[in-house]
Swiss-Prot record:
Family: Belongs to the SelWTH family.
Subcellular location: Cytoplasm, Cytosol; Cell membrane
InterPro entries named in the record: Selenoprotein_Rdx-typ (IPR011893), SelW_related (IPR051441), Thioredoxin-like_sf (IPR036249)
Membrane topology: Lipid-anchor
Positions bearing N-acetylserine: 2
Disulphide bonds in the chain: 30-33
Subunit structure: Interacts with GPX1.
Pfam families in the record: Rdx
Gene: MIEN1
One Gene Ontology cellular component annotation held by this UniProt entry: cytoplasmic side of plasma membrane
Keyword Disulfide bond on entry: yes
Biological role: Increases cell migration by inducing filopodia formation at the leading edge of migrating cells. Plays a role in regulation of apoptosis, possibly through control of CASP3. May be involved in a redox-related process.
The protein's name: Migration and invasion enhancer 1
Protein species of origin: Homo sapiens
Length: 115
């Protein structure tokens, strides 16, 4: 510091760093299967919780709904047969933003409900 008034710079407090910033999500889904609505619903819930997060969508193969966080596959509909619960994805994002180890989401909700 030079001692002159107005010459100091202060980093923003940690709580001002936008939650989820630095976390990148890629969702690959089957558009002909009608999974776009599920992607949009999930992306909206994630953005509500983590406004600074980067979410990218890609068209995938038949039956696909795959989610990567920072390049790591954390959910696969092809493996689980259903869709992830929002709370499980939000928890995985929280872990990623804190630098914690990510685990695969194995809990899933059924792809459809017959009334």
């Amino acid at each position: 510091m030079s001692g002159e008034p107005g010459q100091t710079s202060v980093a923003p407090p940690p709580e001002e760093v936008e939650p989820g910033s630095g976390v990148r999500i890629v969702v690959e889904y089957c558009e002909p299967c009608g999974f776009e609505a599920t992607y949009l619903e999930l992306a909206s819930a994630v953005k509500e919780q983590y406004p600074g997060i980067e979410i990218e969508s890609r068209l995938g193969g038949t039956g696909a709904f795959e989610i990567e966080i920072n390049g790591q596959l954390v959910f696969s509909k092809l493996e689980n047969g259903g869709f992830p619960y929002e709370k499980d994805l939000i928890e995985a994002i929280r872990r990623a933003s804190n630098g914690e180890t990510l685990e695969k989401i194995t809990n899933s909700r059924p792809p459809c409900v017959i009334l």
